[in-house]
Amino acid sequence: MMKFKRFGHDGIHKRLQVGSSVIALSAFALLMTACSSTPSYPPQYPTDPVQPRPVEPDPRPEPQEPDLETPEENVEDYDDTEQRDGLTPPHMEGRDVKRLALLLPFSSSSERLRAEADSMMKAAELAVFERDSADVLLIALDTGGTAQGAQSAARAALNSGADVILGPILSGSVNAAKQVASSSRTPILAFSTDQRVAGDGAYLLSFPPEAEVERIVEYASDTGVDRFAFFGPTSEYGRRVNDAYRKAVRENGGEITASASYSGDDITVMQEPARSMANQYRSTRYQAIILPEGGTALRSLAPLLPYYNVDPSSVQFLGTGLWKNNAVAREPALNGGVFAGPDPDAQADFEASYDRAYGENNSRLASQAYDAVAIGAYVAEGRPRDRMERLEDPNGFYGADGLIRFEADGKPQRGLAVYQIRNGKFVVIDPAPRTVLGPS
């Protein structure tokens, strides 16, 4: 895992006291484009603060998109000039406007994606109003949840003079947006967890499972574990975790001594592989086993191991961020299990701010949209030719999800905490780093 050292950019996340404060309408500009409904503007803050409520991650994999067809029209060439004409509302005339285009699936056929987009839009709006500047223009564009829609939205973003593109969410949409944005070297801060779409100007703000696996394996190795086992699904998510797990174990000087997989999320398909894991335990005495599942599937999987005499008090159960779910924490077989996840202190601050502004829970990706605005505004302050370099600042950024810095290939390096499940609660046993050391 990367080492950390103190970073700068403290002004990026300058916060206003929200409570009963009133923020002038003229301070910021927000433009909603190609969306059936417009969020309230500006956000209204209740007088009495509301305590934040926990937000559980959605363990479902990223929805799949159809492959992008050949573009219907050629993308115009955009020059990398010092000043690009763009959309400027009348009240922002004469200012050095920083244009951030937010590409989200507002009209997706998926109700879940539409709800996610709505919460992310609110978080982005909140970030604009909390940033102490009068020169940020947020341009919201609808992708429809398709690659073709993302391509059209990215083209509209460039035509509006966007300095940075925020989004999209889905991997196919990110690839489509890259095809458009690459000619102008306009950076993209995307929300996909698929690391294969990173690079060529696209930087991922997400939490790839590979990073979580790397963190938890390093932690287990530091506690003396050197014999590891894998027990998970044959899904795309399971494959990614398995590959990352084997790599991390090898890099930390350990070995995989047992492994079993299954297809599906029903307990009946898990029973025989669980029996196999028990048999392998008797012969190899592995010290830790990773269970890359979440929700109902994990609550079905975990009890099978002690049922077949793999004792959680003797074998360390390891997980991924999918474990951070209150129902999972109540599963007795997972008591004592450990997994890696975002910095809880940073997330709590954001959740409280969002709750005060909107009186509701934020979605799973809302914090990433919030950070995207703050980072995007900082990047847009630089000359067009310097924006990639500003994004790849080795000092990184600290935001609503904790520490992040971007590698040159667009992949994120995250400062993750290690959690342990104790009597139905999540307890941080190894805090997330807040400083960056060593090369990126």
Q: Regions from the language model: what does each represent?
A:
Residues 31-34:
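C-terminal motif of bacterial Sec signal peptides marking the signal peptidase cleavage site
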Residues 36-39:
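Bacterial signal peptide processing site
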Residues 54-63, 72-87, 399-440:
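Solvent-exposed, acidic/polar segments of extracytosolic/periplasmic ligand-binding ectodomains
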Residues 116-119, 130, 134-196:
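Beta-alpha junction/loop-to-helix N-cap segments that form part of ligand/metal-binding clefts
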Residues 157-169, 188-191, 227-232, 282-297, ...:
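Periplasmic-binding protein-like
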Residues 204-261:
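An alpha-beta-alpha
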Residues 284-286, 302-370, 432:
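Extracellular/periplasmic periplasmic-binding protein-like sensory domains
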Residues 356-428:
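Segments of small-molecule ligand-sensing domains
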